[in-house]
């Protein structure tokens, strides 16, 4: 029986202040899109600024999608940052409507069922917290309980957003199908059947640094059988945090890569900071 290979790309957030990193991301991402990939799923938040579009970032995003769709069928979940605001529910008020005219391109702004080989997948765009099951039931009550996997861009109960743990996100019964979701930028698994691969590009200090593309290999169409997950880390600039004692700052050696951003957090007593200032070490 043929397996099914899906490449998942999480939250690229094309912005005017990360264009150089985006160029490197596109180059390396396309190298991973080999001919044996059945479909590519872009997990939402391709752009960043909601209803305010920046031409350079928009053109980069459109060009990227155009290149991906020429390699394999491409499914794009509409994320909250792709919408005008975070309160939209299965809405067409986003920037990707014109892309629906392209072949091999599927814009997911409404709950969808996708059949590939012997496998069945659900796809849901971002919906406000608490409305995920409602969105699934839009098509037919509880059809989604019999899929191999659901792709989403959703906040689930218990996921971590920096120091905050979600108490408003959707609760997802442990007997429900596996969900692979965008929206949360740090890789995590709040429960067995929910997995956040994290954003393919690090967007803020404190987010996990070893995120990447996620290759999902489905070998068994039997419901409840989880796929093999292979992380493909890209060699693109990171946002690195270095913790150092103030007494050791003068001997700190940095070897930053091109476009890498580094935050240095110095720790010490009030007295040690006063002594540091007197030494005028820069």
Curated annotation (Swiss-Prot):
Keywords: Hydrolase, Metal-binding
Positions with a binding annotation for a divalent metal cation 2: 45, 80
Name this protein carries in UniProt: Putative phosphoesterase 244L
PANTHER family: COMPONENT OF ATP-DEPENDENT DSDNA EXONUCLEASE, NUCLEASE SBCCD SUBUNIT D
Residues given in the record as a divalent metal cation 1 binding sites: 45, 203
Family: Belongs to the metallophosphoesterase superfamily. IIV-6 244L family.
Superkingdom assignment: Viruses
Pfam families, per database record: Metallophos
Annotated EC: 3.1.-.-
């Amino acid at each position: 029986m043929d397996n099914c290979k899906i490449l998942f790309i999480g939250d690229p957030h094309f912005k005017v202040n990360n264009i150089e990193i985006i160029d490197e991301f596109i180059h390396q991402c396309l190298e991973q899109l080999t001919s044996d990939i059945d479909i590519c799923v872009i997990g939402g938040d391709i752009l960043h600024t909601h209803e305010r579009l920046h031409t350079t970032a928009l053109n980069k995003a459109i060009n990227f999608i155009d290149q991906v769709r020429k390699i394999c069928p491409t499914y794009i979940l509409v994320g909250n940052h792709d919408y005008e605001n975070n309160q939209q529910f299965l809405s067409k008020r986003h920037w990707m409507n014109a892309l629906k005219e392209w072949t091999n391109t599927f814009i997911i702004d409404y709950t969808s069922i996708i059949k590939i080989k012997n496998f069945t997948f659900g796809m849901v765009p971002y919906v406000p917290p608490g409305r995920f099951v409602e969105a699934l039931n839009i098509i037919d009550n509880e059809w989604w309980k019999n899929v191999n996997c659901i792709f989403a861009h959703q906040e689930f109960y218990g996921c971590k957003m920096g120091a905050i743990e979600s108490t408003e996100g959707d609760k997802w019964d442990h007997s429900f199908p596996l969900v692979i979701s965008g929206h949360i930028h740090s890789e995590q698994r709040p429960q067995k059947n929910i997995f956040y691969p994290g954003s393919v590009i690090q967007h803020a200090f404190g987010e996990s640094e070893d995120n990447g593309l996620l290759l999902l290999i489905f070998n068994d169409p039997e419901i409840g059988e989880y796929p093999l997950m292979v992380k493909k880390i890209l060699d693109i600039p990171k946002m690195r945090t270095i913790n150092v004692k103030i007494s050791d700052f003068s001997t700190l050696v940095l070897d930053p890569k091109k476009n890498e951003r580094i935050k240095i957090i110095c720790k010490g007593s009030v007295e040690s900071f006063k002594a540091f200032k007197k030494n005028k070490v820069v």
